Amino acid sequence: MAAPPLLSLSQRLLFLSLSLPKPQLAPNPSSFSPTRAASTAPPPPEGAGPAAPSRGDRFLGTQLAAEAAARVLAPEDAERRRRRREKRKALARKPSAAACYGCGAPLQTADEAAPGYVHPATYDLKKRHHQLRTVLCGRCKLLSHGHMITAVGGHGGYPGGKQFVSADQLRDKLSYLRHEKALIIKLVDIVDFNGSFLARVRDFAGANPIILVITKVDLLPRDTDLNCIGDWVVEAVVKKKLNVLSVHLTSSKSLVGVTGVISEIQQEKKGRDVYILGSANVGKSAFISAMLRTMAYKDPVAAAAQKYKPIQSAVPGTTLGPIQIEAFLGGGKLYDTPGVHLHHRQAAVIHADDLPSLAPQSRLRARCFPANDTDVGLSGNSLFWGGLVRIDVVKALPRTRLTFYGPKKLKINMVPTTEADEFYEREVGVTLTPPAGKEKAEGWVGLQGVRELQIKYEESDRPACDIAISGLGWVAVEPLGVPSSNPDESAEEEDNESGELHLRVHVPKPVEIFVRPPLPVGKAASQWYRYQELTEEEEELRPKWHY
């Protein structure tokens, strides 16, 4: 049996001091008083004699209590550690390498066909002089000269670009924003409001404040009242339960509303970086150019930044990575971010060569079917919107009218529904474009997505609703329900289930169809549009809109 280890003198004394009870001092007999003794007597010990806890016992009890508390709090500590790890991982995704100032792609000299390619000699020269932030990659040079070079793969069966940027990948790229102190500017295209309204934006922004900017209001039909548009947008935002600081109606082309956005950015920025977010081709790069052009009059930093601004193009996926722009004199940077490519938009299914046909270049003009009251009714007919949309009117009131708002390059054709299938097979790629050309039509996926719509006519003096086609435009359903003087028509209207419209809408399979309240466009809209009646408290909570 091994002998117990010998303790040093100091260890013995420490052990004895912890084990022995603390000696009590005897009271001074000369100053003893029974009353004073009763008031100053120490509290009775927990035990008497050998049962009294020693200092060692109290120390052990304290340690055991601390360990028990640690076990109770361990899950919370583990959760905090997990959040810290996620934050570090997300912040590590923040781009730090040199990137093309036109598209944000990391500069590289290996693959000439990939985004971000720069000739090795140019790269070495710019790197030697610390000028890599002034380099434009080969793809952006071609885009700036009008070439349609996509970097985004399609969903419609056509070969896409070399680098496909999906929504999930972009969410991963921008995940660090949740942990940054930033001001978020979210852009939405008014022509494609539902299709370009980026869902789950809080996945990017976290708790950072958001300013909502509506772009391309200059494309709305002439004589449109922007007061009605602003109220309609705010009502839609409230229904989507997105909390924003304010709503701005803007046009990057005419600079309408841009000054108001800049003023609010300067007020809310407070030294933070500013990020421009939005789906692909809502006009982020054009909006940044308009901002820099407006700010250049008073801010020399913004004036200098105009020389190296992001490339603008009709191609989805022009911007491939966050682009840092030195735009503010008072601190903080401006970032143009990649557009989120949504699979449910028309741009995801058509060929890159056909993309310009989806972008309106001038004010939208209403195209009505039937054009007037003397024309044949819609029941039993099918309307083709280019080769991308087919609307079968199964049942409608005699005075129902469908009004199309979208790109002028897409023609509208009406044929009897019984002949619609044969007409589409014969004319797709010829009369019905996009897809343009028989070669593209052979690889076309067709109109496989079908949605049945039952629309009730609520009032006869205003449109019943809009049918919005994601990535294209919208169709206003207008029941011209003026009482008819023809008794046969009146009887037919009464038999038609008290004013119900039955439509069958065909689109490419991934494309979404939205039924929404009618967008108040045109001169007559200010007469039929009704503003929401709100209490003072509701009015205070609603975001304000500006233009």
From Swiss-Prot:
UniProt catalytic activity: 2 L-arginine + 3 NADPH + 4 O2 + H(+) = 2 L-citrulline + 2 nitric oxide + 3 NADP(+) + 4 H2O
Region: Disordered, residue numbers: 24-57, 72-91
EC number per UniProt: 1.14.13.39
CP-type G domain location: 167-343
Pfam families: MMR_HSR1, YqeH-like_C
Record keywords: NADP, Oxidoreductase
Family statement: Belongs to the TRAFAC class YlqF/YawG GTPase family. NOA1 subfamily.
PANTHER family named among the record's database cross-references: NO-ASSOCIATED PROTEIN 1, CHLOROPLASTIC/MITOCHONDRIAL (PTHR47569), NO-ASSOCIATED PROTEIN 1, CHLOROPLASTIC_MITOCHONDRIAL (PTHR47569:SF2)
Function, as annotated: Produces nitric oxide (NO) which is a messenger molecule involved in hormonal signaling and defense responses in plant.
Name of the featured protein: Putative nitric oxide synthase
